[in-house]
C-alpha cells in the first residue's frame, strides 16, 4: 500500500516510521547528514493534507547509526530539525520525533519494543490508543504496532 492510499478516517494520532516512509532508504547505509536526506515522493503533500486531520503526528524511528558511532546524536538532531522545518514550510507538521539509538534488539525502546510508545503516552496523556495509527515499511514497524495494541499499516 502507498502512503497516499491509506484511509485515516477515525484516527487522531499518527505514528510514522522515518526511513522508508518519510525519506528514501540508503541501502546498506544510514542517513548521516542532511545532504543525504531525501523526502520520498508525495510525503510533503500528504503531511500537509494530514495536518488538519490528526491531533498529533509523531515520528518513531530506530537510529542504530548513532549507537554504532557512524554519526553523532547532534547529527541526528540536525537532520530532524531540518526535516521538521521543511515539513512546516510545506504546510505540514511533525509534533515530535522519538528515536532509539540502542544497538541491541532487546532494548525496550528499540522497535518492535514499546518503549517509544510508552514515552508518547507519558508525554501526551490525552491520547486515545484506540485512535492511534502506525505506518511503517518493515515487519518490525508492524510488530511494534501490534505490541502497542494499535493499528499498523505497512507501506511499500
UniProtKB/Swiss-Prot annotation:
It comes from the Bacteria. The keyword Ribonucleoprotein does not apply. One of its GO terms (biological process) is capsule polysaccharide biosynthetic process. Mg(2+) binds at residues 17, 19, 137. Gene3D superfamilies: HAD superfamily/HAD-like (3.40.50.1000). It is found in: Cytoplasm. SUPFAM superfamilies: HAD-like. GO terms for molecular function: metal ion binding; phosphatase activity. CDD domains: HAD_HisB-N. Pfam families: PNK3P (PF08645). The active site is at 17 (nucleophile), 19 (proton donor). Its cofactor is Mg(2+). It catalyses: D-glycero-alpha-D-manno-heptose 1,7-bisphosphate + H2O = D-glycero-alpha-D-manno-heptose 1-phosphate + phosphate. Its EC number is 3.1.3.83. GO terms for cellular component: cytoplasm. Belongs to the gmhB family. Monomer. This is D-glycero-alpha-D-manno-heptose-1,7-bisphosphate 7-phosphatase. The gene is gmhB.
Amino acid at each position: 500500500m502507498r502512503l497516499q492510499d491509506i484511509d485515516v478516517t477515525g484516527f487522531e494520532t499518527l505514528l510514522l516510521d522515518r526511513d522508508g516512509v518519510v525519506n528514501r532508504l540508503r541501502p546498506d547505509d544510514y542517513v548521516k547528514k542532511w545532504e543525504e536526506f531525501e523526502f520520498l515522493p508525495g510525503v510533503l503533500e500528504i503531511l500537509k493534507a494530514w495536518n488538519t486531520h490528526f491531533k498529533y503526528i509523531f515520528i518513531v524511528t530506530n537510529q542504530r547509526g548513532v549507537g554504532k558511532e557512524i554519526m553523532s546524536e547532534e547529527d541526528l538532531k540536525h537532520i530532524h530539525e531540518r526535516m521538521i522545518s521543511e515539513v512546516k514550510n510545506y504546510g505540514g507538521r511533525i509534533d515530535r520525533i522519538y528515536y532509539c539509538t540502542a544497538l541491541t534488539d532487546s532494548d525496550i525502546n528499540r522497535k518492535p519494543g514499546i518503549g517509544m510508545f510508552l514515552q508518547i503516552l507519558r508525554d501526551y496523556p490525552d491520547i486515545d490508543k484506540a485512535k492511534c495509527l502506525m505506518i511503517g515499511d518493515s515487519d518490525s514497524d508492524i510488530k511494534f504496532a501490534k505490541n502497542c495494541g494499535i493499528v499498523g499499516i505497512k507501506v511499500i
